[in-house]
A protein has these predicted regions:
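A structured phosphate/pyrophosphate-recognition subdomain
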Residues: 1-9, 20-27, 96-168
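Conserved strand-to-helix beginnings and helix N-cap segments that scaffold or border functional pockets
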Residues: 14-19, 73-75, 151
């Protein structure tokens, strides 16, 4: 039972990562859901995140693109689960280290850039839907690849997502 936490006022990186990780874990037959303190903006509805409704007791809590506990928010029962985070997957160099384990790459332009590598390491195929979710994270956190945080690796990952069937 795995619960994926996103940050409040969700952007494309946190919800894209949450949805992509959800799909990857479902491919491994895991019981999984996503929780966000705030509603998912309509522009990200295509991610089809399976939102947590209390249907299981989480054994593992994973945060994606959340640099500190203050970013979780307090709605939808978030505080109950954000008190103990097992793993944080993040790209913010200033990550506070609140999780038991933190997978951090401060040179990544988006958490999606890092999560792409994680999903590959899990042995899960990058489906067109996972590619759409991860590409959304890349595109939104880089200002459509205009921000200075955009690197050659960001473009390499974007190209691999397009090859996997991302709908650009």
């Amino acid at each position: 039972n795995i619960l994926i936490l996103c940050h409040k006022n969700p952007d494309g990186d946190t919800i894209g990562c949450g949805s992509a990780l959800y799909c990857a874990l479902k491919a491994l037959d895991k019981n999984v859901a996503v929780l966000c303190s705030d509603a998912i903006p309509n522009r990200y509805a295509f991610t089809n995140a399976h939102m947590f409704k209390g249907e299981f007791e989480p054994q593992t809590v994973v945060a994606v693109d959340v640099a500190s506990v203050q970013l979780f928010g307090e709605n939808n029962g978030m505080t109950q689960f954000s008190r103990h985070v097992d793993l944080c997957i993040d790209h913010h160099a200033g990550n506070s280290g609140y999780a038991d384990f933190t997978l951090l790459n401060g040179s990544a332009a988006a958490a999606a850039e890092l999560l792409y590598e994680v999903i590959n390491a899990m042995g899960v195929a990058i489906t067109p839907h996972i590619a759409d979710c991860l590409y959304t994270g890349l595109a939104t956190d880089t200002g459509c690849f205009r921000f200075s945080s955009t690197t050659a690796n960001t473009h390499i990952v974007a190209a691999k997502l397009i090859e996997a069937g991302c709908h650009v």
